[in-house]
Regions:
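N-terminal secretory signal peptides that target proteins for export/translocation
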Residues: 1-11
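Bacterial N-terminal signal peptides
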Residues: 17-27
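Sequence/structural signature of beta-propeller domains
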Residues: 26-342
């Protein structure tokens, strides 16, 4: 028969158990608010698209350490001068993150500040006014700190505004002519700064008056327009675009139309003369039907050189995740040189 424990001994064991339980709960809770590594696909699957080289993916938590909700992230922008990543949500939140890389791989992300987007009178944007979808940074790579500006496009009430890094609007909102004919919730998702044509925007889906499967890219000064052929996957839509180092554009498309698989397409587009159709070539077609573990990728930003980040919008759904993924676009000639026999 086992020896009977004294009341003092039982109390001590109970305290030990409670302490261990508390520590474990704290560790589990901490894991739930820190980004974790995530695997999009096997090395064999990734190797099927040699023009895309992956450099790390993180699964972001549903909230930061201070309980600020993380979700609905629709676009991101990299500030090279400040080494900061900005992320906007379709509920009017602006997050600022510090990223960590190890040997070129994305391994961490730490939240620094979160602000609400606010109008020129410092009143927070709410409801349909807060539906931020596109983000592009200005003066973020000029070797001067403290002068960055954020250009943000909104969808439900279509317009473009300029903001300070604190989320305060510093310009009157305006709606460019190129946004005409866009259906509700299919507006200006994509923004980029073109070296020749200035700030460009792209509509998510086919606007009224254009052929099915085509959408519009246009300059915000209303001077230039191009037609853009969407990928052939059912429901494919343009969600983001960024400049490539050689002057072409990197396009991010998402096709989500159940019962078809979720498909994320990374494409290269070349703009010819205004008024013409963009020349487009698919670099990678990532499909959940082929074993890729994807989510609703719709945000994109240029890091430096040929490296980019893309982010997914979890729609604040418990069935989805917010993924932040790093990749490089390998130039065809570079790939040919690397794969040539010795």
């Amino acid at each position: 028969m086992p020896a009977r424990q004294s009341p003092a001994s039982r109390r001590w064991r109970m305290l030990q158990t409670l302490a261990v339980t508390t520590v474990l709960a704290g560790l589990l809770s901490a894991c739930g608010v820190h980004p974790r590594p995530y695997t999009l696909a096997s090395p064999e699957q990734k190797s099927e698209f040699p023009e895309i080289q992956w450099c790390g993916t993180l699964r972001l938590p549903g909230k930061w350490l201070d309980d600020t909700p993380v979700g609905g992230l629709s676009d991101i922008g990299w500030d090279q001068d400040e080494s900061l990543l900005y992320a906007v949500s379709d509920r009017g939140w602006l997050h600022r993150l510090r990223l960590a890389f190890r040997h070129g791989e994305l391994v961490g992300a730490k939240a620094l500040n979160t602000y609400t987007l606010r109008d020129e009178t410092d009143v927070s944007l709410r409801g349909a006014l807060s539906d931020a979808e596109g983000l592009q940074l200005l003066r973020a790579n000029n070797d001067r700190r403290g002068d960055s500006r954020l250009v943000i496009s909104f969808e439900q009430q279509p317009r473009v505004e300029h903001f300070l890094p604190s989320g305060l609007a510093v310009s009157e909102p305006f709606t460019p002519m190129g946004a005409r004919g866009a259906a509700p919730n299919n507006g200006m998702e994509a923004l980029t700064l073109h070296p020749q044509y200035g700030m460009l925007a792209g509509l998510e889906a086919t606007p009224e008056g254009m052929s099915e499967g085509m959408t519009r890219i246009f300059s915000l000064d209303d001077k230039h327009e191009w037609s853009y052929p969407l990928a052939s996957d059912t429901g494919s839509s343009l969600t983001a675009m960024e400049m490539l180092p050689d002057g072409d554009m990197l396009m991010l498309e998402r096709a989500f139309s159940p019962p078809f698989p979720l498909v994320i397409s990374l494409r290269r587009a070349h703009l010819g003369e205004p008024g013409t159709q963009a020349e487009v070539r698919t670099l990678a077609r990532l499909s959940s039907g082929d074993g890729w573990s994807l989510d609703n990728f719709e945000g994109l930003t240029h890091l430096e050189g040929n490296r980019f980040l893309m982010i997914s919008d979890d729609n604040f759904s418990s069935f989805q995740t917010t993924l932040l993924s790093c990749f490089a676009v390998i130039e065809p000639e570079a790939f040919t040189a690397e794969s040539a026999p010795e």
